[in-house]
């Protein structure tokens, strides 16, 4: 009897491992919720090119922007749980959007976490016409003239909107929100001073900081960036607890077999945790940080709860 039980356990373990040993046997679809060219797309293509060779299968990046990234999420949530459809998961999809708009997916039940793989540096800048050279000076200016300063975002509920709303909440200030349809048109209005305050991705701001068209005040992340080690964070500038840590990860549909999840998670970590890859992505404000599936699941849960409180307190609504 014991021999039969042992043999059964061995066969069950072998059957569970088999999907991962044979995986992948056909091309993989990697759905990205943004257009080509930005930092998230760059990380997806780095993963794709890094794994396609060793796995001897194409990983096809499929850019599906739209509906605040929800379109891509819906595609993946409805896919077969066989490991052949991945979602480049921006943090807002699962932790912000469900709080501010109606979504057709459950952030906890409809996805399998695979790995967090990067953080994107966001910066607080002002137009040079704004007489503030630090976060403290900006806050003092905003307090002296409530509602006189304006700030841009790429839309209601966007990282820019959330990050600036969080600053207003922590600092007790009020600025006028000017939402745009995307970051590019907002930055086009920031450069001539039509909008005055902006929290946005470093890769889109660094050239303008360098040529003096915008003034850098602080990093919005929880800790200083190696890319800008002398730039203080907003938290260091008098607002402990402030953190706009924009992360990227990979998820799949719910119920993907654990051995496949483990293989994909390990493969992504192997591709990205290479000094040359990190050096290539760092100037774009991309900090590689890979985690286990379990750690990503905890991050999604924690950020969902944190953003829920901030969104409620700040009265943030979707479009």
Question: Which residues does each PLM region occupy?
Answer:
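An extracytoplasmic/periplasmic, membrane-proximal ligand-sensing/linker region
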Residues: 25-27, 169-170, 210, 233-236, ...
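Bacterial N-terminal signal peptides that target proteins for export
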Residues: 1-6
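A ligand-binding cleft/hinge motif common to bilobed small-molecule-binding domains
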Residues: 92-102, 161, 168-170, 197-231, ...
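N-terminal (or domain-start) structured segment
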Residues: 20-110, 148-150, 156, 172-201, ...
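N-terminal signal peptide c-region/cleavage motif recognized by signal peptidases
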Residues: 13-17
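Extracytoplasmic/secreted proteins, especially bacterial periplasmic and envelope-associated proteins
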Residues: 42, 46, 50, 71, ...
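Hinge/capping helix and adjacent helix->loop/strand transition within the periplasmic-binding protein
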Residues: 78-84, 91, 98-185, 234, ...
């Amino acid at each position: 009897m014991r021999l039969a039980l042992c043999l059964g356990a061995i066969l069950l373990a072998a059957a569970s491992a088999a999907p991962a040993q044979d995986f992948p046997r056909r091309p993989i679809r990697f759905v990205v919720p943004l257009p080509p060219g930005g930092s998230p797309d760059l990380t997806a293509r780095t993963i794709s090119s890094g794994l396609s060779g060793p796995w001897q299968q194409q990983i096809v990046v499929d850019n599906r922007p739209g509906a605040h990234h929800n379109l891509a999420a819906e595609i993946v949530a409805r896919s077969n749980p066989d490991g052949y459809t991945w979602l480049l998961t921006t943090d807002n999809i699962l932790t912000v959007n469900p709080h501010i708009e109606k979504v057709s997916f459950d952030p906890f039940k409809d996805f399998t976490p695979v790995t967090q793989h990067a953080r994107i540096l966001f910066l607080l800048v002002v137009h040079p016409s704004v007489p503030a050279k630090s976060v403290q000076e900006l806050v003092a200016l905003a307090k002296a003239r409530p509602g006189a300063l304006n700030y841009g975002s790429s839309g209601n509920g966007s990282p820019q909107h959330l990050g600036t709303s969080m600053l207003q909440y922590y600092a007790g200030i009020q600025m006028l929100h000017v939402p745009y349809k995307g970051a590019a048109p907002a930055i086009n209005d920031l450069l001539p001073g039509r909008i005055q305050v902006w929290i946005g991705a470093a890769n889109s701001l660094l050239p303008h900081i360098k040529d003096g068209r915008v003034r850098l005040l602080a990093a919005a992340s929880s800790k200083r960036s190696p890319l800008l080690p002398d730039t203080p964070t907003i938290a260091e500038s008098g607002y402990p607890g402030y953190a706009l840590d924009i992360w990227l990860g990979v998820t799949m549909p719910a119920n993907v077999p654990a051995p496949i999840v483990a293989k994909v998670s390990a493969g992504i970590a192997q591709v990205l945790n290479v000094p040359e890859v990190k050096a290539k992505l760092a100037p774009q404000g991309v900090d590689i940080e890979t985690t286990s599936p379990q750690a990503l699941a905890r991050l999604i849960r924690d950020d969902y709860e944190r953003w829920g409180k901030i969104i409620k307190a700040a009265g943030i609504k979707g479009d």
